[in-house]
Amino acid sequence: MIPGQMLKGNLEDCVLIIISMKEAYGYEIVQKLEEFGFGSIAEGTVYPLLLRLEKQGFVVTEMRASEHGPKRKYYRITPEGKKEILSFIASFRELAEAVENLMLEVAKNEQTD
């Protein structure tokens, strides 16, 4: 499981990526996060995050009827949301490369000790 502190700064953009793949409602997004290996993330964590994404203009919402109960709020990515994803991916790749370089250096030093 991914430690919460590592997720903290990235979860919002990961949710945005999930929404970019397919319009989705809150609980569906929580399920997708679990499917992708993020572990069990509480809906109480995801809903405020979705509200922030909406306020930032990265997603728009639409209420739709559900076959299984009350209406559901579906989230759809906006052009601004797509730009945010591209920015996140570029930044994350940079970070991943720096961490990889650091880990390689540690491994190299362990071999010489």
Model-derived segments and spans:
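Short beta-strand/turn micro-motifs at beta-sheet edges
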Residues: M1-Q5, E62-R64
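Short, hydrophobic-biased segments on the C-terminal half of alpha helices
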Residues: Y47-E54
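Basic, amphipathic "hinge/linker" alpha-helix immediately C-terminal to the N-terminal HTH DNA-binding motif
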Residues: K71-I89
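Beta-hairpin "wing" of winged helix-turn-helix
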Residues: Q56-K71, R76
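Amphipathic alpha-helical dimerization/coiled-coil segments
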Residues: K83-D113
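A cross-family signal for key residues in well-ordered alpha-helices
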Residues: I17, Q31, L51, V60, ...
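N-terminal helix-turn-helix DNA-binding core of bacterial DNA-binding proteins
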Residues: P3-Y47
